[in-house]
Amino acid sequence: MYANNGDCKLYYETFGDPKDPTLLLVNGLGSQCINYHEDWCGLFAAEGLQVVRFDNRDVGLSSSFEGAPLNADGAAYTLSDMADDGFAVLDAIGVDKAHVMGLSMGGMIVQQMAIEHPERVLTMTSVMSTTGEDMYRKSSRRALELMLEPAATDREAAIQQWVDGLNEWGTPEFADEARWRAAAARSFDRGGVLGGSARQYAAVMDSGSRADGLRALKVPTLVIHGDKDTIIDQIGGRRTAELVPHARFELIEGMGHDYPPQLWGRWVALVVGHIRANS
């Protein structure tokens, strides 16, 4: 199914009962919606939530912005535009207010959603993310190098690129190259936009600090981070929780910048508990 934000088409899928409260899941840089695995979505749905996952613009089956005009800072769009995409998906399914959870860049997007339209955000969960302030944007050199590599267009090279990245920033205890390769192959074979990650990264860098907006938020906020994250150090999550009034910070020991199945249960318990405590 598709939603529309102007000329931008956004592919989305839903799980669970549409009569239940809605949880919108927002992906990170270059990540397709299928990385919120159906089984993981099912765990949330079993807790009484309608779950919505979608491809951000410039990834998967949503619109490509290759060749789009750039602003003065070299960005084809901003995080604000991507936040509007999230609301467009909610509009398409007839939902006025939703709980939102975003990972990495997705965390930045849900922060922007809550800042711009707090009346539509019931609760926010920002995971492995940060505030847009330069001093809290800390990555290992190797992680940054791997993240900024041009997307491979050959299938085997793309799979190896995925594996190399997770070997650097994945959760060490649950490293599983066979699972990583299967996930990478699934994303590559699904097709759609290739090369949008660089444009998404430009949007992140162009959008600046959200500190003032986060300080003013009244949306109930949960912040989750792992202490083994080498793409966005936990100081980014701690800073987010520090800025948002009454935010709760949860550190998951041993977790990197990924979401292995062994941690899904913990994650669902945290998010569902946050939603229920604020409903």
Describe each region flagged by the PLM.
Residues 8-68:
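Conserved HGGG/HGGXW glycine-rich cap/lid loop of the alpha/beta-hydrolase fold
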Residues 102, 106, 110:
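Gly/Ala-rich beta-loop-alpha elbow adjacent to hydrolase catalytic centers
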Residues 247-279:
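Catalytic active-site module of serine/aspartate enzymes centered on a nucleophile-bearing elbow/loop
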Residues 141-212, 219, 239:
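Alpha/beta-hydrolase
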Residues 115, 123-153:
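Flexible "cap/lid" loop of the alpha/beta hydrolase fold
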Residues 59-101:
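Active-site loop/oxyanion-hole signature of alpha/beta-hydrolase fold enzymes
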Residues 217, 223-225:
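Short beta-strand/loop motif that positions the catalytic acidic residue
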Residues 228-232:
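Acidic catalytic loop of the alpha/beta-hydrolase fold
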